[in-house]
Curated annotation (Swiss-Prot):
Top-level taxonomic group: Bacteria
The protein's name in its UniProt record: Large ribosomal subunit protein uL15
NCBIfam families documented for this protein: rplO_bact (TIGR01071)
Naturally occurring in which organism (per UniProt): Rickettsia canadensis (strain McKiel)
Biased segments, Gly residues type: 23-35
Gene Ontology CC annotations of this record: large ribosomal subunit
Length: 153
């Protein structure tokens, strides 16, 4: 016996049955889907349906709620203002407001309805006196601005 004379035993490799390929194929016409209805159509899946068992969405408890009155802030660090000042997008002489930050590209314009809060992340040698008129400030940010000789309006 040589390598080119090897072959599988009869019935060792069974071809899989191709579904919905003619009536004579044994799985033709409806292709095991039954007759009519949502589940017989192509591309249809019932979202969240798990075959009759209680879906995970119903098994898990409801938790929490979305408070309507929470204030949503755009967060700006002192460092972001420092970079904008260095690039010339903001001026030290001007009062820095929400609108000026949007023009300078520090705050995203899409979130124009949100309030602006200043946080204290800045370089160690921050000493620029700034005049700011924003919606909120962290306590550390207030300290940094006041130590540098700035004003919060």
């Amino acid at each position: 016996m040589k390598l080119n004379e090897l072959y599988n035993n009869i019935g060792a490799k069974k071809r899989k049955k191709r579904i919905a390929r003619g009536i004579g194929s044994g799985k033709g016409k409806t292709g095991g889907r039954g007759i009519k209805g949502q589940k017989s159509r192509s591309g249809v899946a019932i979202k969240g349906f798990e075959g009759g068992q209680t879906p995970i969405i119903k098994r898990l408890p409801k938790r929490g709620f979305n408070c309507i009155s929470t204030k949503k802030y755009n967060i700006v660090n002192i460092y972001n203002i420092e970079v904008a000042l260095a690039d010339g997008r903001l001026s030290v002489a001007d009062i820095i407001t929400k609108e000026k930050l949007i023009e300078a590209g520090v705050v995203n314009n899409k979130n124009n309805k949100k309030l602006v809060k200043l946080l204290s992340l800045c370089s160690d040698d921050f000493a620029t006196p700034l005049s700011l008129k924003l919606d909120a400030y962290s306590s550390k940010a207030k300290d940094f601005i006041e130590q540098a000789g700035g004003k919060l309006l």
